[in-house]
């Protein structure tokens, strides 16, 4: 009998136009470039004879499985996603796609984030998922609003300095 696990949380099916284009480009690259290369290498490894002790053959089979798994995921995910390419009617409040500048009330440090879909998060660029605790706390806030965010590192208080939708 297998161990019961709660169902995985569904991620928000929103994405920016840039994120959608990136996922489509990745799917296209996997399907048209990487997969054919791996299939050719797999055929060459299979032609070398005994497959039971053929490390190249085993590696290529595994690699092909990983590519096929990612292709299936991307195909399903792209169908489910909704591209958000317009700014909200209330451009002074924080919604999906917003570029937000925050001030940490405790340290005075200025932080800049963009709220994006879960498929396009990038900590290095300051892109946070709309499903993250900080983004959920930020939604519908306006400039000069002070709010508390319950983050993994503890409770933090922030002030919204600016909201911009120029990137949409």
Curated annotation (Swiss-Prot):
SUPFAM superfamilies: FKBP-like, GreA transcript cleavage protein, N-terminal domain. One of its GO terms (biological process) is DNA-templated transcription elongation. The keyword DNA-binding applies. InterPro entries: GreA/GreB_C_sf, TF_GreA/GreB_CS, Tscrpt_elong_fac_GreA/B, Tscrpt_elong_fac_GreA/B_C, Tscrpt_elong_fac_GreA/B_fam, Tscrpt_elong_fac_GreA/B_N, Tscrpt_elong_fac_GreA/B_N_sf, Tscrpt_elong_fac_GreB. It holds the Pfam family GreA_GreB_N. Keywords: DNA-binding, Transcription, Transcription regulation. Signal peptide: none annotated. Necessary for efficient RNA polymerase transcription elongation past template-encoded arresting sites. The arresting sites in DNA have the property of trapping a certain fraction of elongating RNA polymerases that pass through, resulting in locked ternary complexes. Cleavage of the nascent transcript by cleavage factors such as GreA or GreB allows the resumption of elongation from the new 3'terminus. GreB releases sequences of up to 9 nucleotides in length. PANTHER family: TRANSCRIPTION ELONGATION FACTOR GREA, TRANSCRIPTION ELONGATION FACTOR GREB. Belongs to the GreA/GreB family. GreB subfamily. This is Transcription elongation factor GreB. It comes from Xanthomonas axonopodis pv. citri (strain 306). The gene is greB.
């Amino acid at each position: 009998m297998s161990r019961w696990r709660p169902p995985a949380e569904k991620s928000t099916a929103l994405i920016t136009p840039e994120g959608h284009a990136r996922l489509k480009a990745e799917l296209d690259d996997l399907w048209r470039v990487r997969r054919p290369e791996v299939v050719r290498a797999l055929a060459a490894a299979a032609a070398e004879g005994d497959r039971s002790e053929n490390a190249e053959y085993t590696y290529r089979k595994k690699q092909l499985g990983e590519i096929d798994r990612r292709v299936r995921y991307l195909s399903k995910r792209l169908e489910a996603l909704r591209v958000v390419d317009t700014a909200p009617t209330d451009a002074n409040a924080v919604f999906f796609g917003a570029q937000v500048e925050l001030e940490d009330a405790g340290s005075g440090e200025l932080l800049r984030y963009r709220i994006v879909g879960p498929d396009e998060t990038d900590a290095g660029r300051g892109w946070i998922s709309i499903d993250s605790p900080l983004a959920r706390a930020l939604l519908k806030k306006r400039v000069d609003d002070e709010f508390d965010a319950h983050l993994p590192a503890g409770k933090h208080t922030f002030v919204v300095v600016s909201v911009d939708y120029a990137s949409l």
